[in-house]
Amino acid sequence: MPSIDRRLKDFRTVLESAGLAQALEVLNSNVPHRYSAAYRLTGALLRNQFLFDKRGEVSPEFLKTVPFDSSFCQFVFREGVFNTADSSLDARLADNPYQGVVISYTGVPVIDQFGSGEVVGSLCHFDLVRHALEDDEFEVLQRASRLITRAMLGS
């Protein structure tokens, strides 16, 4: 497997030449998760800006717009990261409507480092089946999140 620095260089190259939608495919290439996505907070909703699906299928409606208070991303905003290999067994998600629907999820914040310094969204890998994310892929996800602010904010 290529080094973390190599994977990030590839991600940055595609991000700069083809945009975030295509860069998510690069980000997803070394993880077991079906989906990689970038969500943007707008009011009380998280809106999917870009989604890569390994199967190339149309994005399910329930993934397009998610109420913030029902999202797994709320934990990313509050705690700086959220990771669960199996949401159906995760007590932190008790009473969450997506518990047991989205099974595995790892998300990190996207921060507006060019303006307010606030969290504006999340970058995540997730699946409808159980997966764990390797430590090096978590590092790639964290570092990639620092590269996508302009693409997320459209600047």
Task: State the predicted function of each range.
Residues M1-P67, R143, G154-S155:
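Intrinsically disordered, low-complexity terminal regulatory regions
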Residues N30, P97-I103:
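Short loop/turn motifs at secondary-structure junctions and domain boundaries
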Residues Y35, G107, S122:
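Short hydrophobic/aromatic beta-strand element in the GNAT-like acyltransferase core
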Residues L41-L46, E57-P97:
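Regulatory sensory and allosteric helical modules in signal-transduction proteins
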Residues G43, R55, Q113, L128-R130:
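Short coil/turn motifs at secondary-structure junctions
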Residues S104-F114:
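A short, aliphatic-rich beta-strand micro-motif
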Residues S116-V119:
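Glycine-rich acetyl-CoA-binding "A-motif" of GNAT/NAT acetyltransferases
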Residues G121, F126-S155:
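Juxtadomain coupling helices with adjacent low-complexity linkers
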